[in-house]
Amino acid sequence: MAGDFKHTERDLLVSKSKIQIKSLFKVFGNNPQGVMDLVNGGISKQELLENHGHVLGLRDINIDVPEKCIRVIMGLSGSGKSTLIRHINRLIEPTSGQVLVDEEDVLAMSDVELKNFRRSKASMVFQKFALLPHRTVMENVGYGLQIQKIPEAEAKTRSQHWIDRVGLTGFEDHYPAQLSGGMQQR
C-alpha cells in the first residue's frame, strides 16, 4: 500500500512550503495587545476572560503545509479551527504572528494585493454559505467571473470545469432549492 502514496516522507522534508503559519496569536477584546504579556506568560483562557474581559482564540499556532500536501485541521466545536483558517486569507487580523503563502507575507499585503490573493489563491467554503436562489448552479458558479468581467464563453468553460470537478455534472440548470445540502455546499 505504501507504493500508492504520491509523496514519501523525504519528499515532504525537501518540498517547498505552500502555507506557513508562525507563532500566530489571536486575542479578541478591546485591547488585545495590552494582554499579550499575560497570554505569553501562560494565563488560562478562563482567567483571561474572567479577569481581563478578553477571549483567547489562538495561542502560538505553528503550521507548515508543503506544496502538494493536504493537512487537516481538526478539533472540538469552539476550539479555533475557523478562526485559524480565516487568518490565512486575512478575514481576521491576528494579534501577532506571521502568515505566509508561497513565501509571501499575507499580513503585509495592500488592499489591492489582498483582493487579488483572495481571488486567485485563497478560496474558502463557509460553514454557513449563501447561494443566489434565483440563479442556476451554472449561474451561481459563474457569478464571481461575471463580476470580474470575464468574457461569457470563458466564464462558462471555467464554471463547467469546476462543476465537473466537484461532481455536479448534470445539475448545471438546477436551482439551489433542488439540490441537497451537501450538493449546495460543493
Residue map of PLM features:
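Conserved ABC transporter NBD signature motif
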Residues: 2, 7, 97-105
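Conserved ABC ATPase "signature" region
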Residues: 38-47, 102-105, 142, 146, ...
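ABC ATPase NBD coupling module
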Residues: 48-52, 106-122, 147, 152
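Helix-to-loop junction immediately C-terminal to a conserved catalytic motif
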Residues: 89
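Signature (C-motif/LSGGQ) region and adjacent switch/coupling loops
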Residues: 110, 118, 138, 164, ...
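Short coil-to-helix segment of the ABC ATPase nucleotide-binding domain corresponding to the Q-loop/switch region
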Residues: 135-142
